[in-house]
Amino acid sequence: MLKNINPTETQAWADLTAHFETAQDFNLSDLFAADAQRFDKFSATFGQDILVDFSKNLITEETMKKLFALAEQTELSSAITAMFSGEKINKTEGRSVLHTALRNRSNTPVMVDGEDVMPAVNAVLEKMKGFTERLISGEWKGYTGKEITDIVNIGIGGSDLGPYMVSEALAPYKTRLNMHFVSNVDGTHIVETLKPLNPETTLFLIASKTFTTQETMTNAHSARDWFLAEAGDQAHVAKHFAALSTNAQSVSEFGIDTDNMFEFWDWVGGRYSLWSAIGLSIALAVGFDNFIELLEGAHEVDKHFAETDLENNVPVILALIGLWYNNFHGAESESILPYDQYLHRFAAYFQQGNMESNGKCVDRNGNPVDYQTGPIIWGEPGTNGQHAFYQLIHQGTKLIPCDFIAPAISHNQVGDHHQKLMSNFFAQTEALAFGKTEETVKAEFAAAGKTEAEVAELVPFKVFEGNRPTNSILVKQVTPKTLGNLIAMYEHKIFVQGVIWNIFSFDQWGVELGKQLANQILPELADDKAVTSHDSSTNGLINAFKAFQA
C-alpha cells in the first residue's frame, strides 16, 4: 500500500527549499556557458526512437540529486511496485490500478484478489480482434445487407478523450472506416454528427461501464431513435450497436446483442481506459494490429518505469522537474505543445489525465494539504500557438514550463513544410531559454539604421529575458508504438507526482457534486414555475432561462 508521507516534512524538501535560495537565480545562458556537456548530461533516449532533452531547465546536477532524494524519501520505488503488483492503491474506491495489465504484452501474471487477470484481458482482446476484422473486411453487414462505413463512438471523459486523441494521432494508419466521436450532452453534437450519415451503413459503440452515464445514455437513446426512424424494426438494433460495458442486463434491454458487449474492469480508471475495450474505436480506426502496436509501445515504457533506477527513469525525471517548478518556483501551469497536427488533441487528453488525477487538496491521511498539488495543463499544436499565446510565455509575468513534442519524420512530406515546422520547434526552445539581450536589440537597430531616439523608445519592448524552461521530446516518427511510448510516459509522470504529493491520483470525487446538483435541478426545468429552492443567483439564472424559453 502507498505510504502516507508529507513531502514537506522530509529532509529532502528542506534541502530543496534551501537550494532554491540559490537556484532561483540560475540563468540558462550561464549554465550552458559553464558546461559544454550540459546537453549530454541532461538528455535521455528511450529506445531508438525518442529523445528527451531536459537541458533547458533551471536545474543543475545538485538540483536533480536533491529531487531524487525527495523521491526516495517519499518511497516512490515501493509505490511503483505496489501499483504494478495489483495492490489496491486507489484506496478511496478500494480498487487496484492496473491499466498497465491491459498492455502487459509479456503476459506475466498480474494478480488481483488472488486471481491472475491476464486470461480475461487476453480474452477481451481476442474478442475485439474478431469484431474489428469482421467490420473492416466488410463481412459484417447492416440490416439492409450493406457494409458498415461509419463508426460513431458515444462516450464521455475517458470513454471519449483517449480514443478520439489516438484515432486522430494515428490518422495516417486509417482503415476504410470513418470514425466519429460524440460526447457532449448538448444535442447539437449528436445532431451534427448524424446529419451526413446513413443508418444503413452506420454502427454505434456505446461506451459506458455501467450503461447509466447520463450524457452517454442520452446520446445513445437519441442515436437509436435516429436509427429506428429509418430502420423501423427494433431487431435491427443488434446489427448497428455494440456496447463497451459490464451491465449485460441494461445492454440487452437497449437492444444490443450481449455477444457484442465488451467488458472491462473496475481496476481500469476512466482516464486510463483507452488500453481496454474502450479502445475498440481505435482498433476500428487504425486496425487491430496497430492497436496492439500501441499497447506494445506503452508496455515498453511500463517496463522501463518499473525496472529502471530513479536517476535514469524518464517519467521520474520529467515528474521531478515538473514538481520543481510547481512547488518551488511557484509555476501554476504547464503547457504541452506538439509540433504535429495529428497530435492536436494530445494536450486536451492530458489536461484530463493530469488535472483529474492530481487536482486534489486533501492528502492520503484525509488532511488538507498546505502545498501545491496538480498544475493546470493546457496547450495547442505548433505553429498555431505561436500566433496565439506564446507572447505571454516569452514576455509575460508568469513562469510556464513547456513541453515541446515533434517528429523528425512527417507522414506528409509536402515541399519544405516539415523543415519550416521544425525550424520553429528548435527556434522556440532556444528563444525561450536564451532570449535576446538589450545589447543585441540595440545592435540590430543600429544595423537597420534606426536613430538613437527610436532605439531608446523601442528597446524595452524588444528585449526577451529568456530563462523560460522547456523540455524537448523528439520522436523519430509518430507511429502506434511511439504514441504508446509517449502516452505511458506522461501517465507515469502524473503517478510519480501524485505519490510524492501524498495524494490519491486515481479517484475523481470532484466531478460528483455538480452531477448530483444537476440531477436535482433537472426536474425543476420541466415546467414554467418560478424556482425558489436555491441561492438567489441560481434561482435568478433558472428563472431567466425559463423566461427566455417562454
From Swiss-Prot:
Residues spanning the signal sequence: none
Keywords attached to this entry: Cytoplasm, Gluconeogenesis, Glycolysis, Isomerase
GO cellular component: cytosol
Coiled-coil residues: none
Pathway annotation: Carbohydrate biosynthesis; gluconeogenesis; Carbohydrate degradation; glycolysis; D-glyceraldehyde 3-phosphate and glycerone phosphate from D-glucose: step 2/4
InterPro entries: G6P_Isomerase (IPR001672), G6P_Isomerase_C (IPR023096), Phosphoglucose_isomerase_CS (IPR018189), SIS_dom_sf (IPR046348), SIS_PGI_1 (IPR035476), SIS_PGI_2 (IPR035482)
CDD domains: SIS_PGI_1, SIS_PGI_2
Superkingdom per UniProt: Bacteria
Main localization (coarse): cytoplasm
Residue positions of the active site: 356, 387, 515
The keyword Kinase belongs to this UniProt entry's keyword annotation: no
Subcellular location: Cytoplasm
Presence of the UniProt keyword Ribonucleoprotein in the record: no
Catalysis performed (reactions): alpha-D-glucose 6-phosphate = beta-D-fructose 6-phosphate
Family classification: Belongs to the GPI family.
Function: Catalyzes the reversible isomerization of glucose-6-phosphate to fructose-6-phosphate.
Protein name, UniProt field: Glucose-6-phosphate isomerase
Species assigned in the record: Aliivibrio fischeri (strain ATCC 700601 / ES114) (Vibrio fischeri)
Lineage, broadest ranks: Bacteria, Pseudomonadati, Pseudomonadota, Gammaproteobacteria, Vibrionales
Gene: pgi
